[in-house]
Amino acid sequence: MKKLSLTLLIVFTTVKVSSQNALNYNVVTTAVPMLLVSPDSRAGAMGDVGVASTPDGNSSAWNPAKLAFLENKKASLALSYTPWMSKLVPDIDLAYVNYTKALSDRQGISASLRYFSLGEINFTDDQGNSMGTFNPYEFYFDVAYALKLSDHWSAGTALRSIFSDLTQGISVQGLQTKPGQSGAADLGFYYQGDYNNIKGGRRQAFSAGIAMTNLGAKIAYSESGNADFLPTNLRLGGGYHLEIDDYNKLSVYLDINRLLVPTPPDEENGAIVAGIDGDDLTPLMGVFQSFNPASKPGGFEEMLQENIYNFGMEYKYNDFLFARTGYLHEHKLKGNRQYVTLGFGLAYQVFTIDMAYLIPASPTTRSPLENTLRFSMAFNIDGFLAQ
């Protein structure tokens, strides 16, 4: 059992960090940050790339537009399990299930559910007195649709319902808490080029994608408290695909993504000395302010620091065996996530199994997923029914 102050729980999950230390840390934080965690092991093994990768049963989590390029009439069910902070506590985890189906050679749909359990927590007040044992959790339900605009381009959208129960409705310092609820939408575009012959009997192709995710109403955990931004995110990426021969294929991906929410200002004695207070902005205004250098204490330089870079590679042998690696880089003043990822996959008949493993890039960078093995499994429903 974990023992955790309710105050700390709320601070680390829903409140923006506004103070800065000598190194000028200014991390952009939001509510429900688990919406940004890679739910599947294939992307997790490639440095969390996904907006331009080849379509699979988890495409809607990264770019709903990729659903239009699923194989004609193919339906699949994907399951993923991610232990969270497994080196510290045994009962925090993220579970994910996704159903996808190609309606035709031009349309695709999906429905998915993500469930994040914080395990069993003994809540205490400021004096350390027990307030009871609870099981906080969050779940997100999505539906997505994609349509080909041409032979190479597609567009897709997703709608998302968000439910976050972190406090089980208990009262904190006279403030009655409640579960946070909101809704959000995704919009994405995807390009998939044809393979062209190159020297040595090999062939190459390119892919690209862009997606804005989690654009929706702010979420609040009390009737009188402030509402927090959802983790609205913009992801842009590209992929290069090399078909070495009939059996061997290599894909390389690069994604750039950033949060589309206001940057916390610099404050001294409760007064803003640099940047702006974004608490009163609407989600749409927050999107525009995220690109405004004047709204950030560090100006244009800080705006660039908020970009996160993802690099991934996937080697495929005979559509049967997959080896993957990747790297994620976040600026040291914006969270300092820097880690290498590894993984492999195996496809046999109607089943595909993927695994991912995360290694911190340096002793000074840590992750809740470090040295943790993650699992995903996909089931080809149409292939099973055809047997």
Where are these regions (language model features)?
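Bacterial Sec-dependent N-terminal signal peptides
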Residues: 1-23, 258
